[in-house]
Amino acid sequence: GDFTFTGLAIHEVRFNKMPVVGNDFYPLDEPQPDEVVPDPSLENTEFAIAIKGIFHGWDASLYGAYFFNDDSYYDPLGYEYTLVDVIPLPGGGVQPIYEQDFVALRRHARLSMVGGAANVTSGSWLFKTELAYTDGYKYTNTEDEKAQWKWLVGLEYLGLKNTTVSLDLLQTWLDDFEPSMMNLPDFAVETQFETALRISRTFLHERLELVFFGLLRGGEGEDGAFERLSATYDFTDRFTAGIGALFYQDGDSITYDNIHDNNRVYLDLTYSF
């Protein structure tokens, strides 16, 4: 078979941006602590490698990475006291009243990940599986680091003209789980099962694409779900227009419980220079 080796180094670390306080998708009732972003340096550089082999009817990959977690944890610094009132006491003197605030910084843990993947084709079917082990997770409500396993199995069907149907099942396990990790601000769960379904079809000589994507968290959607419908049309090689709708359902997950009323209709215009 043919083998390829890929290496990657990211010198400048960038994390996903949280919605601002008051946004419909902001999950908390109060502002988060300040975030610590690692300075660009050799010590903070993220690395990833992958080895892929392609054989007759199937392929396999091994990969590893050393990177920062996009999700942050709170590093507590203590408490800050602010004088908010003074109460006069009988016989003289006063009683100060202080407001206590928890002070912390948001930091990102350094993670180590190893994994593998395999894909097998049979006629119009593609079968795929992935397994990954990641160590180094840190949480606010526990002191020791945690490890996580992720296992994905999926299939794609390409037997219909201009149509692709894919179904993926993902199971996540968190080792050495502690009940305190379920509390604010971690909201961690010991196991999480997810199902993703994507159906796409092209029309008009592949200039128009219709896509349905649905994600179900939990075996019966008890942790929330969402669906996305979209249509994209290529007017020219440079100009593309799209329209779509997003629908959310709540569940036991605080994220979906907070956003289940945030259904959206959107328009996307893209011009490439």
Model-derived features: where do they sit?
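Membrane-embedded beta-strand positions in outer-membrane beta-barrel channels/transporters
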Residues: E46-A50, M113-G115, K150-G154, A196-R198, ...
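Detector for outer-membrane/organellar transmembrane beta-barrel domains
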Residues: N119-L216
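Repeated loop/turn-to-beta-strand initiation elements of outer-membrane beta-barrel proteins
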Residues: D2-G7, G57-A60, S124-K128, N162-S166, ...
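Outer-membrane beta-barrel translocator domains and adjoining extracellular loop/strand segments
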Residues: M18-D24, Y73-Y81, Y139-Q148, D176-L184, ...
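Structural signature of outer-membrane beta-barrel channels/translocons
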Residues: G1-D2, K52-H56, N119-G123, E156-L158, ...
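Outer-membrane beta-barrel "beta-signal"
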Residues: H260-F273
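Transmembrane beta-strands of outer-membrane beta-barrel pores
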Residues: A9-F15, F55-G57, Y66-D70, S122-S124, ...
